Swiss-Prot record:
It comes from Homo sapiens. The active site is at E152 (proton acceptor). GO terms for biological process: DNA repair; DNA replication; error-prone translesion synthesis; translesion synthesis. PANTHER family: DNA POLYMERASE IOTA (PTHR46404:SF1). Error-prone DNA polymerase specifically involved in DNA repair. Plays an important role in translesion synthesis, where the normal high-fidelity DNA polymerases cannot proceed and DNA synthesis stalls. Favors Hoogsteen base-pairing in the active site. Inserts the correct base with high-fidelity opposite an adenosine template. Exhibits low fidelity and efficiency opposite a thymidine template, where it will preferentially insert guanosine. May play a role in hypermutation of immunoglobulin genes. Forms a Schiff base with 5'-deoxyribose phosphate at abasic sites, but may not have lyase activity. One of its GO terms (molecular function) is DNA-directed DNA polymerase activity. Ubiquitous. Highly expressed in testis. This is DNA polymerase iota. Residues 249-314, 325-439 are annotated as: DNA-binding. Interacts with POLH. Interacts with REV1. Interacts with ubiquitin. Residues 55-268 form the UmuC domain. Residues 672-702 have a biased composition (Basic and acidic residues). Keywords: DNA damage, DNA repair, DNA replication, DNA synthesis, DNA-binding, DNA-directed DNA polymerase, Magnesium, Manganese, Metal-binding, Mutator protein, Nucleotidyltransferase, Nucleus, Schiff base, Transferase, Ubl conjugation.
Length: 740
């Protein structure tokens, strides 16, 4: 891995039992004997299982340095180092011949090699772009490709090998040769099914490496084996720009060649420390150690997994990576000890992330801030906080609108103060900003009203349990309950993660009810069932709850069940709006329910409605309603909020409503002004049911289409009004804007 301060992600092992190696070998021997008189072709292609898989691990040579040499060919034959801060994070082989090593201090590298050419590699953009080009190229050979950082990929060639073997004739199978090296110079048995499969895999691996060089100018090593663990280990035996195939009989030889258990991919720093405390240092120690004692110390699943890894057993599948599930930018440094310095670094990281969001096209819905405090230990612990991104900010992300910088920096600094007591001395060595929960919104080309009436997004995209992987982050394999402490602040909106290496990249959302759970016969009068089905589930619940309360309270009740729901029901009926009196006090209660957040733990900054500017739209609607209550004549109504409820739902979801780009206050509150210096006053009269919002200019008069209620129109948020006007204009409706 080439990224500064980041270790390779562990592959991990599956917990499923593999078939016994000796029994499988005997079975193969029986198959070979029975088929010896039938020719080789008939015995090939047994049912694929763990032992018959063909996995390739591709590892690019000095990746960052190669990208720099491709960019500037004059550097090709010179000793080259890629510098990040005070370290040479990687160097080409010319520099390595002269004594320069990866992660060497710049000063030491210059002493070793005075003619060393250094290039700045702190901007990862070009490396990232080239990395994805490599992955896309490998996907042309097999669709099952798993990224491991920038410079490594796993490719599952099992199906491709199957197809090639089916195309070969019997005499051609006997002439199959290996491409590259065979580990330990083991002899090849062309009557062995597994040998033939791995040989074909080596030929495909050679084709992939040739394509990488011809199309991208990159060289790399490859390892061909029956699982990810062995493929990764064997790929580094012959370097650079070479490949090696591992036959099953040499598996134990490769495993025992490792000098220490921490060289086994999948065994991290903490687990290695625990094993060392038990007297386990070598692979053989781990193989022969008592399973019961190991399970007692590490837990059953971890103990079984790492003991299987020590025998070279790894059932973990190659996981199709697809688009990245998160974007992160990080910066490591010797010392950051002031809030101003931290803010400057966060702004730099955020600017880079915003560019990546523009290029990707998806919109992140969660932001995470990660810090690393100074520690004398070799492996530092990381802490993180994350929270949802307000919908009005999401609307601007990816549009190139840098007005989003200010609210995003505000959010990140609030997260920062929840981890760091800025009133006390602190010493940080790393800051990282991560955008996750990326969603490709189909509404990007649709109007806001279209979004309300379109079929709802799949449950997996809006709710349920999501797992987001940070591919460049090292995740320990120690039991999660021992390793990670996730505590939710009282608000439930900010998630805290503390790990030895990196945050656990998981976000939980409340599970939505299926639409079919709601009886359509209980809908309020005037509500179209088909339109109702397309509404977000929480709005459906609100409408139904209002209907239910109306039924039980009776006609003589003073309360009005659908006060805050009038904005929703206005989409169904004109008349219904005029029949419902309004009590702003109800809405105020609901608004406070959204904005108020319990204070944080002692020593950190509190999150409250006054400091959380990002929890509402650009104007503070709760504050506005408070002031309006002082000035307006308000009829008495129930003290209990009647319309907008967040009970029995995850605050992470409910605090920012499911409507995109609109806050709940914007949708359900009365639009309060058309001029920043002027407030309109609601009256108790019939006309006061909706505020008398004027067109943007006193010289403009809008003539609406015949089926549009002007009162309902002026109830909509300004962004929706503008979009409707634009849509009507494009559609050539019978409306016009007159100028006096």
């Amino acid at each position: 891995m080439e990224k500064l301060g980041v270790e390779p992600e562990e592959e991990g092992g599956g917990d499923d039992d593999e078939e016994d190696a000796e029994a499988w070998a005997m079975e193969l021997a029986d198959v070979g004997a029975a088929a010896s008189s039938q020719g080789v072709h008939d015995q090939v292609l047994p049912t694929p299982n763990a032992s018959s898989r063909v996995i390739v691990h591709v590892d690019l040579d000095c990746f960052y340095a190669q990208v720099e040499m491709i960019s500037n060919p004059e550097l090709k034959d010179k000793p080259l180092g890629v510098q990040q801060k005070y370290l040479v994070v990687t160097c080409n082989y010319e520099a390595r011949k002269l004594g320069v090593k990866k992660l060497m201090n710049v000063r030491d590298a210059k002493e070793k090699c005075p003619q060393l050419v250094l290039v700045n590699g702190e901007d990862l953009t070009r490396y990232r772009e080239m990395s994805y080009k490599v992955t896309e190229l490998l996907e042309e050979f097999s669709p099952v490709v798993e990224r491991l950082g920038f410079d490594e990929n796993f490719v599952d060639l099992t199906e491709m090998v199957e197809k090639r073997l089916q195309q070969l004739q019997s005499d051609e199978l006997s002439a199959v040769t290996v491409s590259g090296h065979v580990y330990n110079n083991q002899s090849i048995n062309l009557l062995d099914v597994l040998h033939i499969r791995l040989l074909v895999g080596s030929q495909i691996a050679a084709e992939m490496r040739e394509a990488m060089y011809n199309q991208l100018g990159l060289t790399g090593c490859a390892g061909v084996a029956s699982n990810k663990l062995l493929a990764k280990l064997v790929s580094g035996v012959f370097k650079p720009n070479q490949q090696t195939v591992l036959l099953p009989e040499s598996c134990q030889h490769l495993i025992h060649s490792l000098n220490h258990i921490k060289e086994i991919p999948g065994i991290g720093y903490k687990t290695a420390k625990c094993l060392e405390a038990l007297g386990i240092n070598s692979v053989r120690d781990l193989q022969t150690f008592s399973p019961k004692i190991l399970e007692k110390e590490l837990g059953i699943s971890v103990a079984q997994r790492i003991q299987k890894l020590s025998f070279g057993e790894d059932n973990s599948p190659v996981i199709l990576s697809g688009p990245p599930q998160s974007f992160s930018e990080e910066d490591s440094f010797k010392k950051c000890s002031s809030e101003v310095e931290a803010k400057n670094k966060i702004e730099e990281l955020l600017a880079s992330l915003l560019n990546r969001v523009c290029q990707d096209g998806r919109k992140p819905h969660t932001v995470r801030l990660i810090i690393r405090r100074y520690s004398s230990e070799k492996h530092y612990g990381r802490e993180s906080r994350q929270c949802p991104i307000p919908s009005h900010v999401i609307q601007k992300l990816g549009t190139g609108n840098y007005d989003v910088m200010t609210p995003m920096v505000d959010i990140l600094m609030k997260l920062f103060r929840n981890m760091v007591n800025v009133k006390m001395p602190f010493h940080l060595t790393l800051l990282s900003v991560c955008f996750c929960n990326l969603k490709a919104l189909n509404t990007a080309k649709k109007g806001l009203i279209d979004y309300y009436l379109m079929p709802s997004l799949s449950t997996t995209s809006r709710s349920g349990k999501h797992s987001f992987k940070m591919k460049d982050t090292h995740m320990e394999d120690f039991p999660k309950d021992k390793e990670t402490n996730r505590d939710f602040l009282p608000s439930g909106r900010i998630e805290s993660t503390r790990t030895r290496e990196s945050p656990l990249d998981t976000t939980n959302f409340s599970k939505e009810k299926d639409i079919n759970e709601f009886p359509l016969c209980s809908l309020p009068e005037g509500v179209d069932q088909e339109v109702f089905k397309q509404l977000p589930v929480d709005i459906q619940e609100e409408i139904l709850s209002g209907k239910s309360r109306e039924k039980f309270q009776g006609k003589g009740s003073v309360s009005c069940p659908l006060h805050a729901s009038r904005g929703v029901l206005s989409f169904f009926s004109k008349k219904q709006m005029q029949d419902i009196p309004i009590n702003p006090r109800d809405h105020l209660s609901s608004s406070k329910q959204v904005s108020s957040v319990s204070p944080c733990e002692p020593g950190t900054s509190g999150f409250n409605s006054s400091s959380s500017s990002y929890m509402s739209s650009q104007k503070d609607y709760s504050y506005y309603l408070d002031n309006r209550l002082k000035d307006e004549r308000i009829s008495q109504g129930p003290k209990e909020p009647q319309g907008f409820h967040f009970t029995n739902s995850n605050p992470a979801v409910s605090a920012f409503h499911s409507f995109p780009n609109l806050q709940s206050e914007q949708l359900f509150s009365r639009n309060h002004t058309t001029d920043s210096h002027k407030q309109t006053v609601a009256t108790d009269s019939h006309e006061g049911l909706t505020e008398n919002r004027e067109p943007d200019s006193v010289d403009e008069k809008i003539t609406f289409p015949s089926d549009i209620d002007p009162q309902v129109f002026y109830e909509l948020p300004e962004a929706v009004q503008k979009e409707l006007l634009a849509e009507w204009k494009r559609a050539g409706s019978d409306f016009h804007i007159g100028h006096k």
